Amino acid sequence: GLCLRISSGPDNPIANYLSMMGLSYTRLFMDVDSSPAEGLNGEAYLYGLRTDSLTLDTIYLDVQQDLNGINMLSGVVNGPKPGQEAFDVTLEGNVGNNSAQLLVQYLNARKEQGVYMGVMADLRRHGIRMKVFPEHPTLVYRPFTVNKNNYIYLADNGRIHANLDLHDEQGTGLSFYTNREDTIAKQDMTVELSRINLKEFRRILPYMPDMEGWIGAEAHYIDSGPYMMVSSDLRIDEFKYEGSALGNWELGGVYLPGEAKDHHLDAYIRHDGEEIAHLGGIYLPAEEGTGSLSADIAFEHFPLNVANPFVPDRMVELDGDIDGTLSMKGDPAKPLLNGELALDSVTFFMPEMSAMFRFDNEPVQVVNSKMMFKEFDIFTKGKTP
């Protein structure tokens, strides 16, 4: 048999190396035994895990094997922190010869159940069939209902069959289904999200940024053999980030593969019902290397103030909008940008200095990814540069 025992504090070569990578912990303990007679058994604990943006008090794992398979109990326990309430996340699972299941539970500091939902999987003759349970799972502290005959079947030939409908009484939920009546397409599946309240999900995603809004989305995938298509549409209504209202947003696009192994994408962004950006492009892979990209992106009254909530400590505040078209060509990792951008009433405010800068409305040329501010004026007050 195999026996592995590890006990580690915060001061050793491994801990010191992890500290250089921005990861530290208070104590690590592991005790695992494996033998032909008793199988795999053991436990592990990690205390005081810290990164730049994450602090977790306890992470644990317990594994026991018996005649029915391998049983696992794992989780994260975290006490109250500034701006973050305590929580307890538990993962309970079992892996047998022909089946497996995993159950997730989330409790807050008051032991209120924010999440209670599981997935079971059965090995079938030609694939794996999965099912969501129980019939009334809990999400965002509310009861949901999943259809009794729900399933997601992953076939050996790569096809997916699904019939999953998970919703609550308010219409919030998820649908994932395939069109089995389509005799032409090899694959025809759709995923839909409806009335997802971002503010509610902050209660079960501890380190999620302060966001509010309502999400609706739909993605459709069709594979008819020689041709395939992916289309998607994402809507965020009444969006707020860190308390700043950013309006209504819609992002959509269509992806099509070409006959010469090229990839075509057409996408758009709308803000408060008006299209503010459009992208159309082709990616051509190469037999060696990274391939080449050729795309055009057009801006029409793209508002710059939407970037303000994402600036750390509000060091700067932008206003105004931009118009124009840019072409992107070359290596997808570092394409060259060329084109022209028109700045419309663009201002740049630095609160700490109480300084306001107003940019000239003259078009700015972009040449090989460099903005050419030739004979370009920046005003601080009045009309004098």
Where are these regions (language model features)?
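Interface amphipathic segments
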Residues: 1-218, 224-385
